[in-house]
Amino acid sequence: WFNRTSENGVSFYNPYESWTYSTKTLPMYNTKTPYTELAYFGTIFANAQKESDNLHILTTQNIFTELNFTSENDRFGGDGIMQSEKNTNKSIVTSFNYLGKRYMMHTGYIHNKVIRKENGGTSDNSMVRDTTLDAREYPINLNNASTDLIRNTFFLDQQYRIPFTFIRNIKDRKIDKAFKDSLLASGDTARIDSLDVFLARRRAAREAADTLGDNNITTAFIGHSSEYSVFRKTYADQITDAAGKAFYNDVFNYNPTTSFDSVRVMKLENRVFLRLQPWSDDAIVSKLNGGIGNR
């Protein structure tokens, strides 16, 4: 837990990253037929004060062979163990991805909202040791406090593949020329008469070949990646009782009964990169990368 890494680099949002998606973890789909998931799971037989309920809705389909659309809605919620621990975590995701022979693109929108009640812990630690008490009976420091977190992310990743087919074409022309020269030198008139047809078939086969999966050709990739994210956290409370005032050492600089604090982080990233694959993708030197960006 303490060694976890942050996808977004926003400290107050780190604990919630595993409950939603990032631009790196958002799954992209490619389906032959429309696909939908509906799921509900929770502790339906638990006490109503402590039950949790979770909802998952996913739908995805290919608009065209290369273009896919996906929408997902997730909700995680629970009332907690002690008083004022109710928590709701909602995520809404919309994404498109395009997978062509030369061009590839991923784009989407990620929305995450967390509404969390705050109790400040129990005001009497000795009651925790009393096993006859239910956790709901523990006195708490804050009776009317909450924290809201909202995150909105727009992202676009795209790249264009440029296979250096001219190198292979030069090799193929040399092979064709060598075959033609050897055949002419043999003097076989029947095979010489069909030479043009044979070479035409070879050229047609090469032109019709799908180079998307050809990993053994020198290739360049030009790509662009961008992300715009806004993270906002707000804390609000109303404190009129002695326990709540003691929790904050009775220090209220602006309002003696009400607090409202907020923080906002905006992240804008743009990156352009160039990747060169000199030989095959599993060679000793498989990729050479370079790029620039701003954040």
Model-derived regions, located:
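Residues on the lipid-exposed face of transmembrane beta-strands in outer-membrane beta-barrel proteins
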Residues: 38, 57-61, 94-100, 156-162, ...
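Extracytoplasmic loops and strand-loop junctions of Gram-negative outer membrane beta-barrel proteins
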Residues: 19-20, 39, 76-78, 135-144, ...
